Design a protein with these regions (language model features):
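A short acidic/basic microdomain associated with nuclease active sites
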Residues: 145-170
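Acidic-basic catalytic patches of nuclease active cores, encompassing PD-(D/E)XK
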Residues: 120-153
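Catalytic cores of nucleic-acid endonucleases
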Residues: 182-231
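Major-groove recognition helix of helix-turn-helix-like DNA-binding domains
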Residues: 48-66
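Short, charged amphipathic recognition helices of the HTH superfamily
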Residues: 3, 26-45
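Eukaryotic helical DNA- and histone-tail-recognition domains of regulatory proteins
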Residues: 8-34
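Interdomain/boundary linker segments immediately adjacent to catalytic/signaling cores
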Residues: 74-130
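Conserved catalytic cores of phosphodiester-cleaving nucleases, focusing on short active-site segments
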Residues: 140, 144, 165-169, 178-186
Length: 252
């Protein structure tokens, strides 16, 4: 059994997500922070670079094998490659399986750089926030070539560079770049937060900074683009949060 996400093929990750949702049903759904299967299909499918319908189809394929209320594809046995995944991973307990699904989208790495917003934020809500953020980034990558405002741009993913935006776009190798910060919302409306770094960069770059908001993961994702968001229709209010850090010291 392979538990290293780097060694698991992309299609197998989609199959495993479907298997997890079929086997653990609404309990598993809740552990990932989702309220409905549709939002889980949308977020996980897009985050893994696949289609939401693929996750649903794999879940339905496994449904007849587990005691959940859905009939699934009861008229036939799982396809050989799905049966092979079931044979290898079907006995995983819910916590181990959930951790595996989270690892597909770099949960541990993101958790180390994007701490919970507050002590009260539950792990499931935290997981959903990170999953939704990655899904929004993948959504942007998929639609960017067809957006006239970013047409013919070379795109660099800067999410791991800590530079205050997620993507750097250039039309010419030596020309000025455009910065795109991507945010994701479950609903059509919701709160959007900028970190201190993101706000500073947005202010400095002005019209070269874009806020790309992916909305409605709960049903059908769509997007809205805000150029120079600090000067546009959005009103940002500064919030301060005090973090208490505890350490233990000893003299040697």
């Amino acid at each position: 059994m392979i538990l290293d996400p780097q060694q698991i093929p992309d299609r197998e990750k989609l199959i495993l997500a479907g298997l997890f949702l079929s086997k653990f049903d609404k309990v598993g759904l809740g552990l990932l922070g989702f309220d409905t299967f549709t939002e889980a299909f949308n977020v996980i499918g897009i985050a893994l670079g696949g289609k939401p319908s693929s996750i649903k189809n794999y879940r339905d394929e496994f449904d007849p094998l587990f005691p959940n209320p859905r009939a699934g594809w009861h008229h036939r046995s799982p396809r050989p490659y799905c049966a092979a995944v079931l044979e290898e991973y079907g006995d995983l307990d819910i916590q181990t399986f959930c951790a595996l699904i989270k690892s597909f989208v770099g949960y541990e790495a993101k958790a180390s750089t994007q701490p919970p917003k507050s002590r009260d934020e539950k792990e499931s809500a935290y997981a959903r926030r990170l999953l939704t953020g990655l899904a929004a980034e993948r959504y942007f990558e998929s639609v960017q070539p067809g957006l006239s405002i970013f047409k013919s741009c070379a795109v660099e993913n800067t999410t791991r560079l800590g530079c205050g935006y997620d993507f750097r776009l250039r039309r010419k190798a030596e020309g000025e770049f455009l910065a795109v910060e991507v945010k994701g919302l479950m609903e059509m409306t919701g709160g959007i937060s900028l970190t201190q770094k993101e706000h500073e960069v947005a202010e400095a770059l002005s019209f070269r900074f874009f806020l790309f908001v992916v909305k409605n993961f709960r049903e059908t994702p769509c997007h809205e683009i805000y150029r120079d968001p600090l000067a546009g229709p959005l009103v940002f209010e500064k919030k301060k949060r005090i973090v208490v850090q505890v350490s233990w010291q000893a003299s040697a």
